Amino acid sequence: MTNPQSPSPALALLLSSRRLGLVLSGGSARCSFQVGVLETLLELGVRPALCIAVSGGVWNGAALAAGTVHRLRRYWRAFMRMPYLDVGNLLREHSPYRFSEIHRRTFSRYVGVERLRRPEALPLLIGVTRLRDRQAVYCDARTAADPLTLLLASNYLPPFYTHAPVIDGERYGDGGLADNLPYPRAFAEGCDAVVLVTMKGESEGPPYRGPQDPDHLIPPRFQERMVVIRPRHRLSASFVERRWPVLLQTMDLGRLRAREVILGESHPETDVQAEAGALISILSRLLLTRVLAAGRRPHPPG
């Protein structure tokens, strides 16, 4: 654990906070960046009082809440080693993808519902989108009747998932559709400082909050109470990245960026521009934005 005698302004803000919030945005496989950030936060003695996560960030948030961040890299490794395509799944789920099944297996092994329900578990709010009106809804994973279904709901996005999870009679979908950067919710929950971890590179423009706000500007009233940790440039990992060396590199990049932002260190490794897969990455972002934007269109009456 690092405890500098004269902490940087960012670290001083986080350590002096009476109620620190942590917000983990979505980003699919790019959320591997968050793994390194979480490791660094814990090493520096930064202990959030609340975590809010959406979409791909919910799996990392669940590990933090359950106290299993030390197992996160193995969690991701196990997930990526499982076959994610199965033609037979077309008959069962109307999709060749097995992501729901893989998530169920790895979550049970590396996190577990019972750990989320322990008294010492970190409060974890999962953001989902209520599909009938496209509104953001936040549910506490610790008290949810079925936490895993809640986590899957925050990731629901066709064609990777074909059946929208139903919770208490309502159908829910990807939490990033309604708000990919729910930091205002953290302040509304009484947090006096917030760490926001998101995956859009600084050189790509302001953070991505959603299809209607792809270049979000954080209001000044929030900026002074926030520490935003994001890559310098577009990540090499694609949204559907499965190459373990690339994901491992992204995790390590998260560690270094967290130290740069929080401690003021300088690491040349973080200033490397992504080269391979640039076109695929751009096309993936455009496709995802189009899918999410289509999901926000109001349904015709009747």
Model-derived features with residue positions:
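Patatin-like phospholipase
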Residues: 1-54, 62-302
